[in-house]
Amino acid sequence: MMKKLIILVLISALAAGMIACHDNSSDTSYQKETKSVVQTEYETQPEMQTSAIQTEALQEVTEAPVQKETGQADQKKTDFDPYSTDNVYDLNPALFERQDGTDYGTLLTDVTYFSTTADDDKRVNILLPPGYDETGAYPVLYMIHGWGGDYTAHLYDGSYLHMLYGNMYRDGLAEPMIIVGVDMYTGKQAIKDDLDGYGLRAAYDKTVDDIAVDLMPFMREHYAAAQGRENTAVAGVSEGGAKSLCTGFQWLDKIGYIAGIAPDGNVISVSGYYSDSYWSIPYFDVLPQPAQDTMPIYLYLAVGSEDPWNIHSTEYFSEVLESMGVSHQYDYVEGFGHDSDFWRVCMYNFIGKIFK
């Protein structure tokens, strides 16, 4: 009897042990299965019912794809390649004229700011785009006039640049942007009329620093001007074309888009260009080499076949840029001279390729 009792006890203990082992095995299997489901949902997210904990976890992991899509959308804006299309110079004159029913934005004239570079007040004209919102952030194009001009040369009520931008914006050819008519003269206003060519050239050179040090901060403080080189462009014609190249290469970390239209040959030394003259004094001994992250986003050079002065200098600048490995677009355009007919078609091309 005692032997039977002992045997029954041993059998009961063994059965309990087997049941316990089975329960532990089931727990381990469930944990592995649950972990596998979470990993699978992270990668493929199949349609299935999930617990509250799993649902919360999935909400957290799916935030990553949302951020990625936002980044892709931001990147898509920079995927536009301004070098992928040729520029156009045979344009309808109506592009530069006022058209009924077109919003040409808001033109602010004779806006004054203090320039520490000039140690005096300077003035600019400012074009705000249609629908301007002071709480927004708009890229800015700084436009520099030629020798003897001022901030009103290209941007005044009804000017070609004023009408051109409004018409391009209406047709979806231009991005919302602020355009600033820059005064290249950077010095004491009281002595401007007394300066000779060398003195005027020295005052013009100072605009390179004035734009970056004084004017850009003024625009950000008083207007909805976006920061960053991807939101900043500089363009100029003739002497202003030289200064736009100087400004762009002096401040590569601040300026991403540069246009030198028939630029004078004083950015760097150009052999045979007005020797021993204030026209030929080089601003740079050597053109600064951009780092990989400060390469111009779009660099545009153009000159007309009938230009009496700056064909050689423009071509030389292009050759130097090519030797430096700096991407740029150089157009030698048949039939155009050194005048506003050329400036306006070039600005059409430049405005259509910036801030995309």
Which residues fall in each region the model found?
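Bacterial signal peptide processing site
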Residues: H22-N24
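Non-catalytic cap/lid and distal C-terminal segments of serine-dependent acyl enzymes
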Residues: K32, Q54, V61, P65-K356
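Post-signal peptide N-terminal segment of mature Sec-exported envelope proteins
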Residues: S29-A52, E56, E63
